[in-house]
Design a protein with these regions (language model features):
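Structural signature of tandem-repeat unit edges
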Residues: 1-13, 23-36, 46-59, 69-82, ...
Length: 110
């Protein structure tokens, strides 16, 4: 089962539902070549614990991290200008700094 992913520098976007339901996925390395994270990319990746989104990313798709129940920490740079609906829906373990950052970006669960 897939536990770790390093996306190569030649990739510029992560397509919709690319890693959906990879239940054992614990870590993902996203390079600075990525500009967008599609819809549902990490949907129901129940073992993913933290994610750092690089400064190159401007868009996080709807439901991108939906139901990532172990996700505790997310680092979102100022370059992100759009976060889709329910991108972090049911991420019940998110720490306070991550929640404050999402609030700062005017992200709401709708």
């Amino acid at each position: 089962s897939l536990q770790s992913v390093t996306i190569p520098n030649s990739v510029t976007s992560i397509g919709d539902y690319a890693f959906e339901q990879c239940y054992s996925l614990q870590s993902v390395t996203i390079p600075n070549s990525i500009t967008s994270i599609g819809d549902g990319v990490f949907n129901v990746c129940k073992s993913l614990q933290s994610i750092t989104i690089p400064n190159s990313v401007t868009k996080i798709g709807g439901g991108a991290f939906r139901r990532c129940e172990s996700l505790q920490s997310v680092t979102i740079p100022n370059s992100v200008t759009k976060i889709g609906n329910r991108a972090f829906w049911e991420c019940t373990q998110l720490d306070e700094p991550s929640r404050l950052r999402l609030k700062e970006l005017n992200y709401t669960e709708n």
